[in-house]
Each structure stands twice: as C-alpha cells, then as structure tokens.
A protein has these predicted regions:
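N-terminal targeting leaders characterized by basic, low-complexity, disordered sequences
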Residues: 1-5
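Extracytoplasmic "Venus flytrap"/periplasmic binding protein-like
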Residues: 120-122, 129-194
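Acidic, glycine-anchored loop motifs typical of Ca2+
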Residues: 77-80, 95-126, 130, 183
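Bilobed periplasmic-binding protein/Venus flytrap-like ligand-binding cleft at the lobe interface
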Residues: 196-248
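Short, membrane-interfacial amphipathic segments enriched in basic
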Residues: 10-22
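Hydrophobic membrane-insertion alpha-helices, especially the h-region
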Residues: 33-52
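Aromatic- and glycine-rich beta-strand/loop motifs that create alpha-glucan
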Residues: 23-30
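Alpha-helical transmembrane signal-anchor/signal-peptide segments
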Residues: 55-67
Length: 248
C-alpha cells in the first residue's frame, strides 16, 4: 500500500540506483581528478612506448656546430644540402645494428661568433636569429656532456669556447688517428684538424660546398661516467670513422 501511495504521489518514474552505480558515482565524486591524472599518465606511457618501439635505431652520431648552416630545404627540386652531406658520411659508417640500413644522426647547432654577429648586424636586410642561437648554445653545452656524439665538426669559435685546457678538455688528442707519414693534414692544435686539409673535404664536393674550409675536425674525450654499457662500442666506431675520413 505504501508503495502504491508513493507511485500515486510521485509517479512511477522513480529509479532506484544499484549499489554498484552508487559506489561508482561516489568514487568519481571524490577521485575524479586523480583518475584523470592517472589516465593521462597511462596515455603518455603508451605513446612513448610506441614511439620507442617504432623509432629507427641510430648507427652513428655526428655533431656539427657552426655559424654556417647546412640547409635542409630543397632548392628547385634538388637534393637538400643536409641530405647530400649525410650521404657522404654514409660511406664511412657501418651498419652497427645489422638491420640492413645505415641510420646517421647528423645533429647541427647554429652558433655565431661575435664577429659573425657584427657582420650580420651591419648587413642590410639581415638579422641575427638570437632565439635559435640561444637554444642551440644551451643544447650544445648539454650535448658535450653526453657520450653519444663523439665525432664533431666545429667552427674555430666553438672549439675555443669548449676546448678547456690540456688537463681538462672536452676534446681528445687527434694526432694519433692520421696515417703515419701523412704530412698533408693541417693541425689547428693537438686536438683539431682543419677540414680543408682532409681527404674527406678534398674528395667530396658536397662537403666542400656546404661546410666551411676552416671547420675543425675533432673527437671528444671518452666518457666514463653516466654512459651506457655500449659506450665503448660507440667510441670505437667514432675512432674508426675518423681514421677513414683522414686516410681515404
């Protein structure tokens, strides 16, 4: 009778929630933002995992830091300068992981010297990209502390900024990598060789056309702290590639 009176008074559309629904609503009320944050974290983990699984393994890393950019843009349908330079490096690099292809990470940094900045500022219709230079300078400083990019091509300005002292330098002595009796190489110091004196420069038009003659060829010191187990292999590959470039 009581139930009938309720139906007459309030109608028959009254819905009684199940205990499970009530618990879910209560949970959502108190833990809504926790749940959203957890879901976001799960999505990030899944996306990063997929990217890591699909990312192509790198066989060799090369660093280039200079005020002379190597364009990645095609001009009149031609192969971009960046791709042409990488194609040259491909001749010296081995397929480290044995997957049938060579994947070279050629990372470039735009770093101007004070003289180059002054020259650009005094040239009509030209301006210095300070934002790019600032971000690249920060990235380069961080990169010099990592053992992935051992083989480096740098401007004289960058070299002087990071060379340090003979007792504490980011670069390793380079004289031991040249063929014995080779007197054609021009050493900027015990740690650097002028690019235009190397077979790499002389025998490859793509290098001559896109990298300044006074670029310096260097190799970083071997890292022993904060590096992966494959660090020894990476350094050995960098040494082998350097020898090939100097003795072609």
């Amino acid at each position: 009778m009581e139930e009938n009176r309720n139906e007459e008074q309030y109608g028959s559309d009254i819905k009684i929630k199940s205990p499970l629904t009530a618990k879910l609503e209560n949970f959502w009320y108190y833990y809504k933002w926790h749940s959203i944050a957890a879901l976001f974290l799960v999505i990030c983990i899944v996306v990063c995992s997929l990217q890591m699984c699909t990312k192509e393994a790198v066989d060799f890393n090369i660093m280039y830091a200079s005020g002379s950019e190597i364009s990645r843009k095609s001009v009149d349908g031609d192969t971009p300068a960046y791709n042409r330079v990488v194609s040259v490096f491909d001749k010296y690099v081995e397929d480290a992981d044995g997957d049938g292809s060579k994947n070279i990470a050629f990372t470039t940094y735009f770093i101007l010297s004070p003289d180059e900045i002054k020259e650009i500022e005094n040239t009509p219709d030209k301006e210095v990209n300070y934002a790019l230079m600032s971000s690249d300078t920060d990235a380069l400083s961080a990169r010099f502390g990592v053992g992935d990019y051992y083989l480096c091509f740098v401007s004289e300005y960058v070299y002087e900024q990071y060379r340090g002292t003979d007792d504490l330098s980011v670069f390793a002595p380079i004289r031991g990598y040249a063929p014995k009796g080779d007197n054609e190489l021009e050493y900027y110091s015990d740690y650097a060789i002028r690019l235009d004196s190397t077979p790499l420069y002389k025998n490859n038009p793509a290098i001559r056309e896109n990298m300044p003659a006074d670029t310096l060829v260097t190799i970083q010191i071997k890292r022993v702290v904060g590096v992966g187990k494959d660090n020894d292999e990476k350094y050995a590959r960098a040494e082998e590639v350097l020898r090939k470039m100097l003795s072609e």
